[in-house]
């Protein structure tokens, strides 16, 4: 069973990043212009996938899906190489894809390492290139399943804390965690009002979170980033929620610029703020995180 069930358009696997074996390309939904336009960035090489990740064609959990699908594409690219050259080619692909975004590079390395390990096992056992390509594509889908199941469960945990008839303020686009709590709200028949802070400069809140919430049937209002404290003072917001790019082992939360001021305002007005995510053992403290 796929874990993107009952989620909106933007979170369906094929609409995040998808490797087409017949065409030999990875399609990535261009979130920079969605929902005004539904266009896909077509990548014919793993280098183009890495560039798309670096250029913010996709974000949040999107780069993880793109990296895994990019490894399948790399296997397609190098299918006519000698065994030794094929392995080196895949190692280069794993490095390029995992280091496309500095802030999440350590987490991305786990994605490409899994793909590379599978590749090494298959090639060692004498698998044909078409079998390798298919296996890496399926592995990318399975990695999606694992990530979606974990993150939507975290989102569901937040949803269970929110009473019926509440209003929430979101920031940026927490992707699968957002999908998780929205889906859980629907499953438990809760009537929730969603305020989406626009989140400059890419407007992920206005374009992505708001589109997903509306797509899934919620009463959704986009607000400018400088309206947040006013709405809090007018008691129009009951809960604040965002994702977290990195949570270090000392409890520090690193996220989109602007998160701190929302958290401070929420604290001032006595509004619960939930940053959804998981501690990253690669970072002991916030000082070790490279900020883009």
Tell where the protein language model's regions lie, with residue ranges.
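Long amphipathic alpha-helical segments
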Residues: 6-127
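Glycine/charged-rich beta-loop-alpha catalytic/anionic-binding loops adjacent to active sites
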Residues: 32-35, 40, 44-54, 135-141, ...
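Short, glycine-rich nucleotide/cofactor-binding loops
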Residues: 40-46, 78, 167-175, 249-254
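Gly/Ser/Thr-rich loops at beta-strand to alpha-helix junctions
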Residues: 61-63, 168, 172-178, 201-202
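Ligand-binding beta-strand-loop-alpha-helix segment within the catalytic cores
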Residues: 109-164, 190-192, 196-240
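Histidine-anchored nucleotide/phosphate-binding helix
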Residues: 178-187, 263
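Conserved phosphate- and dinucleotide-binding cores of soluble alpha/beta proteins
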Residues: 199-292
């Amino acid at each position: 069973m796929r874990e993107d069930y009952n989620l909106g358009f933007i979170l369906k696997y094929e609409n995040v990043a998808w490797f087409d074996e017949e065409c030999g390309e990875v399609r990535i939904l261009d979130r920079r212009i969605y929902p005004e336009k539904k266009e896909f960035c077509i990548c014919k090489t793993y280098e183009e996938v890495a560039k798309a990740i670096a250029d913010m064609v996709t974000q949040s959990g999107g780069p993880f899906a793109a990296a895994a699908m990019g490894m399948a594409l790399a296997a397609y690219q190098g299918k006519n190489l000698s065994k030794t050259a094929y392995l080196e080619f895949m190692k280069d692909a794993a490095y390029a894809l995992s280091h496309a975004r500095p802030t999440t590079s350590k987490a991305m390395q786990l994605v490409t390492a899994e793909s590379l390990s599978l590749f090494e096992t298959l090639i060692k056992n004498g698998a044909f290139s078409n079998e390798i390509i298919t296996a890496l594509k399926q592995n990318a889908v399975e990695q999606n399943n694992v990530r979606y199941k974990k993150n939507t469960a975290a989102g569901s945990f937040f949803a269970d804390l929110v009473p019926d008839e509440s209003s929430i303020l979101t920031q940026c686009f927490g992707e699968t965690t957002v999908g998780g709590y929205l889906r859980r709200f629907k499953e438990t028949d809760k009537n929730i009002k969603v305020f989406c802070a626009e989140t400059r400069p890419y407007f992920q809140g206005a374009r992505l979170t708001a589109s997903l919430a509306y797509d899934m049937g919620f009463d959704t209002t986009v607000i400018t980033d400088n309206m947040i404290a006013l709405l809090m003072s007018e008691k129009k917001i009951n809960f604040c929620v965002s994702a977290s790019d990195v949570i270090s082992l000392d409890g520090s939360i690193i996220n989109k610029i602007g998160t701190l001021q929302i958290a401070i305002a929420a604290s001032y007005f006595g509004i619960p703020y939930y940053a959804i995510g998981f501690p990253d053992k690669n970072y002991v403290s916030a000082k070790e995180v490279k900020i883009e």
